[in-house]
Amino acid sequence: MLKRPKRDPLKDCEYVFKGDGLRRVPPYYYEYITFAKLRWYGKTLLEVFNTEFRDRESGYYEKAIRNGQVKVNNQIGNVDTLIENGYIVSHHAHRHEPPVSDQPVGIVHEDESYVVIDKPAGVPVHPTGRYNHNTVLHILMKENKCSLLYPCNRLDRLTSGLMFFSKSPKAAEEMRVHMISKSLKKEYVARVIGEFPNSGEVICDAPLLTVAPTLGLNRIHPDGKEASTVFKRIAFDGHTSLVLCKPLTGRTHQLRVHLQYLGYPIANDPIYANKRVWGPSLGKNGEGSNESVIMRLSEIGKTETASPLLQYEWYTNETEAEAKARRDKRLGELLTGKHCSECGTPLYSDPSPEELGIWLHALKYESKDWSYKTQLPKWALDVCCRDPNALPIE
């Protein structure tokens, strides 16, 4: 029986810092290895690569196959090789990882079973897509000399704050039970557009449905999964509010979508506070059809970086000409027009550190046995400092 070979997860792991707020990984060669999927059976090797892996320009995979960079069952394949059940397909590629924030992964607590961290915004948790070494898991393994870790809770790449990792599958299962327990209390802070109600707790019980998985788009929908969040305003600075968020369920993008639905989206959220996608209402009360929202979001994703392009118009004093110049500059930041001299891959420009996160932070997790908390991020403290009536966060 064919087996996928083991690999050193930190092979070629090297970090470069230039003092510009970014952590970089120099390009390196990497062997992508996978078992054939059921939907691949009976298709040619070239057909599989052209339909399943679209991160390369047209013609790249045919050239890679003809150059011997693609193997089937450890044998060099050709464009007409038919994929069958049990086949192992590999691709030797020059890998270019996107830069991430250079902020360190803070250790909140560590014992023989768990590591509790303060995750920086803009860093994915585990290898996915174009990210491999520029992930929380590999950073912990490389810089903190941690052995193999198992994530126990999930934070989006753009979100910062508390995360739990176990050091064994057994400990991971024990923590998983904690995480789904209704006795577990979670607290987040978010900085949102506008003056959030100051009338005590605001509860949102709107159900959530993933309407476009490839775009990461979730919306309020009657056929969605049950979701419940308790919100409370902490401070208001005249433009934005700092809101304490207590999720009672754990749905994808729950806090981001509930805040948008209430009319107070996270101020720099590239999806749910984007006027080009949602229009002037920014999706309040679920306004906008799925079809129109998906179409606009898809178009923006093809031409622009995942950044809150228009969100600051309510917050800055820039002229219309300055705003247009800023937008035009962003339009060219996705691809530079240059190519790697070694592999021909189109090169992306670097994001600014501000584009690597949103104003959403996992602040505190508490069970009957333990309690862990991080410091408030600077963007949250900034709001509190501007409001003399800001409430304390216990």
UniProtKB/Swiss-Prot annotation:
GO terms for biological process: enzyme-directed rRNA pseudouridine synthesis; tRNA pseudouridine synthesis. CDD domains: PseudoU_synth_ScRIB2. It catalyses: a uridine in RNA = a pseudouridine in RNA. It comes from Schizosaccharomyces pombe (strain 972 / ATCC 24843). Belongs to the pseudouridine synthase RluA family. It comes from the Eukaryota. The active site is at 156. Pseudouridine synthase that catalyzes pseudouridylation of RNAs. This is Pseudouridylate synthase C18B11.02c. Its EC number is 5.4.99.-. Keywords: Isomerase. GO terms for cellular component: cytosol; mitochondrion; nucleus. SUPFAM superfamilies: Pseudouridine synthase (SSF55120).
